[in-house]
Amino acid sequence: MSFPPALAAESAPPLGFGELEKSGAVIGEVRVDTRNIFDLGNPAESGLFYGTVNRLHIVTRPEVIARTLLFKSGDRVSLQKIDETERLLRTLRIIHDVEIRPAAFEDGKVDIEVTTRDTWTLDLTGSYSRSGGNDKSAFGVKERNLLGTGLSVGYSRTSDADRSGTEIDLAYGQAFGGRTQIAFNRGRFDDGARTSFLVDRPFYSLDTRGAVRGGWSNEDRIDPIYNSGELVSEFRHRLKAIEVSAGWSAGLVGGWTRRLSAGADLRDDAYRVEPGRALTIALPLDHRVRAPFLRYELLEDEFVKVKNYRNIARTEFLGLGFHLQVQVARSLEGLGATRSEWLYAAEASDGITFESGHKLLGQATVERRVASTATPLTQGGFAVQLYAPRSTDSLSYASIAADRVRGGGVADQLLLGGTQGLRGYPSRYQAGENRVLANFEQRLYSDWYPFRLIRVGGAAFFDIGRAWGGPNQNLVNGGWLSDVGVGLRLAFDRTAFANVLHLDLAMPLRRTPGIKAVQFLVKTELTF
């Protein structure tokens, strides 16, 4: 494990956690050391700018990190828990880097030191993006680590192709002194409003024995329908949803975790003609779902640590173990549903590492849900991703995904276009009951690190795909579509917000009048 100088240990006992576990060592003192964004002792980060940023930032409180740890004083050393703790800490966007090391070992007891380095968490949003021919802008302020407590508070004003308005949100992942998550969101837009509230104590680790969840949302909006990238129909959609569930698990046994949950989904969807808006399709039908459910989950504990895959020069974890989740529900007319129906959802994923070091990830899904026609809809599909490193700073990436729906109406069709992965075309350019999309990229990860703030990378890409079948096909350009392009990737890895800026030039290879010869896309993503 490699860390910046500020995270490197001056000395360490000769044994690693694996050897300590085999020796039966017990954890003594656990020390948490939370550090500021920049290491002022590093000559590359010792300037006035870095010192000013550190002074403006409030460092994460040690107890925030301590409550995330899966081990404590008196426990026997477990390499699995050490590794999983590192994975959990790296998922916290308020953390830039993590080191967990044995600090001292004597008489069968080992002291452990956990060192973290913060990210900049105050987001003064003033952003613009263009993707699929659509512009999106945002202005606001969001603090993801208020006073170092892990509390996230934000206000934003956004505008995109569908709506504009303001939102406030609050989120806290350590409520009641533990691991309970609380989140609240309230938005007011030119086409309606949205409110949601969530209380969730999840299965936060592979060995967690119980989980409880309750969520509520209420939304009023205008839903658009597009054909050939053009807006052709709009209607008002009001929806209310409630979910409650509780889960049980025996924990991690022999490298596998099994979980069983029970709960209920309640959902009301209502549709209305909106005055002044064109409606060229049949209005969707109101429907209600009242569905008790059972959910089963199976997870294999297999992760690998990599670098220069989905991010630039940052430690990542890829899950290569088998994961299965199956949920079966019965929507009951006797509980207030529009009609009694069996509903289900299943998802399975797995990963393989080849002798060459290349990694293949696969996923398959199937779902039966109530569609906008108030009748059942079945959707199934698969996705495969290949990561093929060429060197420490370059990687070939390929993905292919295919899915199909049977049942439902125009509002339930599968979409394909610029914001759906086909970068050379307008957003929602094709729609249909069947969809296939393949993306190929050659990624470059440079060592250039301007101002110790921005990691720089690039990509050349080729996309090909098609959506077809159903009542809302693109009859103008409904065949296979493809594009080629190049892009710059700027990873702001010292910040807690959307980390990777994508600057792409994409050229569609099958154009019709109205489609630009070159699409310029600007957007922020969490990954490469």
Would you name each region that the model predicts?
Residues 8, 323-528:
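C-terminal transmembrane beta-barrel domains of outer membrane proteins
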